[in-house]
Amino acid sequence: MKLIKLKLASFRNLQNIELAPGKKFNVFYGNNGQGKTNLLESIYLLATMKSFKQARNAELIAFAGEFALVKGTVERDQVRREIAVLIEKQGKKAKVDAKLMTRLDDFFGNLNVVLFTPEEISMVRGGPDLRRRYLDRAVFTCDLGYLTAYHDYAKILKNRNALLKVNETTGIEVWTEQLVQAALLVIERRKAYLDRIGKLLQGFYSEISGNDETVQIEYRLHGVDERLLAEDPAGALNQALRAHAAEERRRGTTAIGPHRDDLYFGLNGRSARQFASQGQQRSFVLALKMAEIEHITRCFEAPPVLLLDDMTSELDRERNRNLMEFLKKREMQVFITTTSLHNVDIDELQDNRTFRIKEGKILD
């Protein structure tokens, strides 16, 4: 899978861009604030219909603009498809080969991407929201039904929270029952993904670290009895919700569910968050992204497009080398941003193209 053409109109500070990326490594360099990350954001949006910065539609449109347009030509197995996303303040519209997509499930999968940002390096030590965001992105790529399950859960959660905010108990049982069923679907899909990448994670971590340290990744439900969950999943969630009922009324929000769950990262049987060194934590996240890439490659029998946002400044020389060696072995397209070409060992990257970005313009 390759992105062979990209066109942007009024997307953030990228006014009129036409780009023909190389099929392997594409390096975009320039000072901060010139548009490098915006370029990666446009590719991510072309694949997922979302901004990885959680930006509103209006923020994606250039100043004084009415709309933004992102178009790309994707090639897979010698078949080309034209993808377009129109961004207006009131919403987005997507087309594939000029056909308007009325179901998002028909749109997704035409371009698969994996994103690696400095934010994710802090995923081990950071808050649970970072880990949930990573997990949702990773699960969704190979499990398109996850998006529907998650959106259903989010709608039910919103309605239940609305009752809690006004301390209205009438009807709360109905929403609680629906919440539990929707939550179980989300949890099931999240856990299934973690089961699939567990062995991959260990293999890549061993390759990076060069030692026999063991790593674990586990799903942790907030406030739920894990032993009861195995026997009676719905009963375990209902019990947890009952136990937190007073807290929910006091706070006016749902205290139990996938929106509060977390991931446990283990190293040699202990919490990586508490006991791993900074180097070990970075190796863990790097192995996690490698496992994600390998998983997607197996799902679609084609590697995803990789977006590396200023990662060369976040990884030390050895981990940079490990990442690049991993990428060189795979027939995948990579987009790299950096403030300086000195941060990227260009000579070691075969089939590379470099682009300078200045004030929203791309200079070859």
UniProtKB/Swiss-Prot annotation:
ATP binds at residues 30-37. GO terms for biological process: DNA replication; DNA synthesis involved in DNA repair; double-strand break repair; SOS response. InterPro entries: DNA-binding_RecF, P-loop_NTPase, RecF/RecN/SMC_N, RecF_2. One of its GO terms (molecular function) is single-stranded DNA binding. One of its GO terms (cellular component) is cytoplasm. The keyword Nucleotide-binding applies. Its main location: cytoplasm. Keywords: ATP-binding, Cytoplasm, DNA damage, DNA repair, DNA replication, DNA-binding, Nucleotide-binding, SOS response. It is found in: Cytoplasm. Belongs to the RecF family. HAMAP family: RecF. This is DNA replication and repair protein RecF. It comes from Citrifermentans bemidjiense (strain ATCC BAA-1014 / DSM 16622 / JCM 12645 / Bem) (Geobacter bemidjiensis).
